[in-house]
Amino acid sequence: AYMSFLNFTVGYTYGGFMDLGALPSTIDFQGPNGATFYRATQLSYTYKGLKDFRFQASIEAPAVDGTTSSQFEIAQQRMPDFTASAQYSWNSSSHLRVGGIIRSMTYTSTERDKASSVTGYGVQASTTFNLGKKWQAFGQINYGKGIGQYLNDISNLNVDIVPNPEKEGKMQALPMLGWYAGLQYNISPKIFLSSTYSMSRLYSEDGYPNDLPSTYRYGQYFVANVFWNVTPNMQVGAEYLRGWRTNFDNSTNHANRMNL
């Protein structure tokens, strides 16, 4: 639950390091694997004093997932996450948004018997815009270190922070990338088609995960669907979804799914 008043929002709602307005339509709830999609307890402020511009900043409760062992534990976090974004809109269905996040991730080492922190960061650009009267484009790109918690495909891998094989008793934040691009074609005011391709990628650093060849390296996502807005309060659709996962040993698996 959350509450908004005088451009302030407090409570549990969608996070500041994402762009709901640039997400393509999918029946799949999470959406593209390279998109950022999450909720957080937060205090945020939105400034709308400039025509066509919107600026937002938030302080969010941190959620850190890491690859731990008998040597490491994720500690109670000492700092919130900080996000900021700026958005320019040139009509009701077209905008460009840039944003960023910075976070401090705390862990404890059983060898050192003390808490340490790793700094993570992320940058993001997203857009949606008209291409004539029938087409709508969507896109987003995200890059950073230690932002796995926010990327759809990587959020379940516990890789916000991981052990550093080259520094005994230390953990590190790995680089990661996520992006998507999609198109929507409006057949009529009530019926539209859309298709999106997306990718998320985890990069190796300081020898991790050289000894874990089955670790996720990158994933790909393709979706195509059709929607019919039967009434203002009722929408039906059908969707084909295909996903691929490739590990650091280059083994690849895939799956297909139909959604209604």
Question: What are the functions of these language-model segments?
Answer:
Residues 129, 228-230, 253-260:
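Outer-membrane beta-barrel "beta-signal"
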Residues 1-5, 18-31, 68-70, 106-115, ...:
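Surface-exposed loop and membrane-interface regions of Gram-negative outer-membrane beta-barrel proteins
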Residues 15-26, 140-159, 242, 249:
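Outer-membrane beta-barrel translocator/channel fold
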Residues 1, 39-43, 80-84, 121-125, ...:
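Hydrophobic, lipid-facing positions within transmembrane beta-strands of outer-membrane proteins
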Residues 6-10, 51-57, 93-98, 134-137, ...:
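Repeated loop/turn-to-beta-strand initiation elements of outer-membrane beta-barrel proteins
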Residues 34-38, 75-81, 114-120, 170-176, ...:
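Transmembrane beta-barrel outer-membrane domains
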